[in-house]
């Protein structure tokens, strides 16, 4: 099922499968989100929960049992309950039912996704509550994909990623399987812009740590049109696109937790996490994205 809201600038559609934003159009009717061509990448803007990246061996252990887990958790692959779709707000909820706890993740949780339109900005808040009787440890992140180019008159090299100040981000290195290898390097030094090319992501994504910038955006160089994500408070920000020539979309991904590492312990309670909630506690994070195009 899908729900749609709109204001004077934007029209947003969210699917209850994965609580995923699947369409965002401006007043000209132009589609701003990637439309999930399965020949390139079959998603639009998935929620990453309760882990980000891959699990070493594709498994984790909890409560004496081994659980299999795919990339970026499972919230993106299951049905969420629509709570509200009116005015400028869409709200959905996912809770750990018996099937989830038996097959995917043996901990109680309630994940609430709230989308709110505010002028040309979409605020997407993810709230996690622990309704159980034991600690809840989880990872979480965002993965929106934006159409590139903005129109037929432009090509890949007409675009660049920009920070709001010069940056020398620490790039966390990964093995070809996507798991972190414990090393890092500097890809760019004291740069405020990263030129977009068709080969930029030939070796997959860039996981950036240590950013001081409050924003990461994709800009059309000759017009100034842009899409900007507020990444303030996020320890990790990734940029990525699927292999395609020319580039069809770009992702700007603020994460509150690290991707999995090759030497991560199998015990879930020893894994790095975005947060560890005691019973009754609640935690939230918001991604605000502004569309000036």
Label the predicted regions.
Residues 148, 152-232:
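Active-site/ligand-binding surface loops and adjacent short beta/alpha elements
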Residues 101-151:
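Acidic, contiguous internal or C-terminal segments within carbohydrate-active enzymes
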Residues 14, 60-68, 126, 275-292:
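Short Pro-Gly-centered flexible turn/kink motifs
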Residues 70-119:
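Extended, loop-rich substrate-binding clefts of extracytoplasmic carbohydrate-active enzymes
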Residues 11-66:
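Acidic-aromatic substrate-binding/catalytic surfaces of carbohydrate-active enzymes
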Residues 18, 96-98, 115-119, 130-132, ...:
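Beta-strand elements of well-folded, non-transmembrane domains
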Residues 226-293:
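Active-site pocket scaffolds in enzymes
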Residues 1-8:
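Short, Gly/Pro- and small/polar-rich lid/capping loops
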